[in-house]
């Protein structure tokens, strides 16, 4: 709470506080519910890891009788101001649930590869469900880099490996890294047009 107040006291429109409970295996039910309610009360983004490994899924089924996304929905966590990172082990029903709740899903391919999560991100299922798909890097310790261009390339290549050479084309990949990311963060950006935030970079090709 002090961190949120201190960040808002800066009155800087380029810095926004958020709540980041790590994952279902490190955060108690009561703490999850507190975080979700506080985020709603203060209109904060709620970001967390979800279904990153098979063990996480199996442990959740054993302890709670359901898969991780269903568990978070049951305790009132899922919502439009949420970003679920990884999602490698989500099944089709969970992906549909996240899309229904307007939860953004962040694919972190470099981190997934480095940590050996045991499966590729289910791009085709996420795209079919219409969920807001973004691309992330995870932390530097899980990636050895925070290079978004590298993550964009890896995300596109892994989608092609599982599906077809034309899956996740350049336009889609760019949208995931820019427009969809802005939507997930609640930013009026992602387009180059009058009235939008000028969130721009120059790339030397």
Question: PLM ranges: what are they?
Answer:
Residues 74-81, 123-205:
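His/Asp/Glu-enriched, well-ordered alpha-helical/loop segment
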Residues 36-45, 77-80, 97-106, 128-133, ...:
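Glycine-enriched alpha-helix->loop->beta-strand junction motifs that scaffold or abut catalytic
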Residues 1-89:
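Metal-coordinating catalytic core of metallo-dependent amide/deamination hydrolases
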